[in-house]
Amino acid sequence: MAHRRTDSAGTARELLQQLGDLTGRILDQIKLQQARVELAAALQRQVLAAELPALPGLQAAGRYTPARGGLDIGGDWYDGFLMPDGSVGFAIGDVQGHDVEAAAHMGQVRTCLRAVATATTDPAEVLGRTNDLLVAMASELFVTCSFLRFDPATGELCDARAGHVPAVWATTAGRCEIVLHEGGLPLGIHAGEHYPASRRLLTGAGAFVLLTDGVVEGPDYPIDDGMKKVADLVGDACCTDPDELAAQVIKVADLTGHNDDAAVLVLRYDGLGEHARTGGG
């Protein structure tokens, strides 16, 4: 009997030791995952523009939400900056993946776009040269992206996209459309890719909205439905403060049925094209 009790006690100690070891490994994994999330979040904060450029008659606002309630920091980002010719550039993009590598690559893409824009401000050329740089870096990740240039002197908006979801354009005069012009392949796949640009003159007040696919597409939500929802929302609220409009648009992501990260960039303008033509001051 004493021998059996000793065996039982030994077995219990072994089980407790194994349980302790398992608990320790689980805690180590939790700490490692937490560190990864914190690192990715820090990289994300460095990439997301803390303050978007504002010009007379033009305001911009952005929104970003991470995946899985903040547990996955993905590769979605937006950016805005003044360019050497006096125009302003805006970009939004989505790097493949939801991890530290995606967040780090997102920073590289943003840096490439800004660097290229010091040499040329044409959106087609900006995307083309950035694509060639990323291909030369030989990363396994690809990037969808839209880049646009707004000229405050003329009111012209020129944009190009690389495998990215369309933008939405609405005016206070009642016009609203999903901008379905031709685009090129995502960045980082093939060198020498061509990215067609579209141009429009912003002659009246309205809003131009850029977004990532996490806002409009998911397992339970076809992208066409998502784009229509955003278009209806922007058409009804294009006069709204851009920060409020961005907050409304990002909520469409709640309908998608998944937990992808999502980003929105809203440009609200006051008819600078008309102002430029009439010479008003």
Task: Indicate residue ranges for each PLM-predicted region.
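C-terminal catalytic subdomain
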Residues: 15, 203-204, 210, 215-281
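… and, occasionally, acidic/histidine-rich disordered N-termini of signaling adaptors
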Residues: 24-207, 256-281
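Intrinsic-disorder/low-complexity, polar/charged segments
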Residues: 3-11, 122, 240-241, 278
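Short acidic/polar alpha-helix capping motifs at helix-coil junctions
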Residues: 8-12, 41-44, 130, 215
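Short amphipathic alpha-helical signal-transduction/dimerization elements
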Residues: 20, 110-118, 216, 231-238
